[in-house]
């Protein structure tokens, strides 16, 4: 789709915002882009035809997205933030690390990330982020 889309799940604190690269400025004008979160930049490798992805995290999505304008491969962005302001840097690094691990294990994408990430969280925070991650996967696959 060539427009900006959002997604939420009932009783979940997260929110997704997605759209094509051509709509990036419109996406970055949204209030959600001022929050910490995780994001995916996706495209297709023109030589192999295989999907490519870069997985990242940021304290301010908007600022980090502008840093990726020099990466030519991506055509679509989707990012996830918390509606209740409860995602911390440690949370986003934990989520990023888990998502990179999952993507490597699935072996369906060419992963653009060169550095692994991750963060150790207290057990209760890790459990909360695993629930958040399950919802991210649910929306991403929809």
Segment roles from a protein language model:
Residues 1-36, 44-51, 61-142:
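Boundary/linker segments flanking structured domains
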């Amino acid at each position: 789709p060539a427009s900006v889309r959002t997604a939420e799940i009932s009783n979940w604190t997260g929110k997704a915002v997605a759209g094509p690269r051509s709509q990036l400025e419109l996406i970055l004008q949204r209030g959600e882009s001022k929050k910490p979160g995780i994001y995916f930049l996706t495209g297709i490798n023109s030589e192999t035809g295989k999907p490519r992805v870069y997985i990242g995290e940021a304290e301010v999505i908007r600022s980090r997205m502008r840093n990726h304008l020099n990466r030519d491969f991506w055509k679509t962005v989707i990012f996830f933030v918390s509606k209740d302001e409860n995602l911390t840097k440690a949370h986003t690094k934990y989520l990023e690390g888990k998502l990179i691990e999952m993507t490597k294990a699935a072996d369906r994408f060419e992963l653009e990330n060169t550095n692994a990430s991750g963060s150790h969280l207290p057990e209760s925070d890790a459990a909360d982020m695993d629930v958040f991650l399950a919802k991210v996967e649910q929306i991403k696959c929809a």
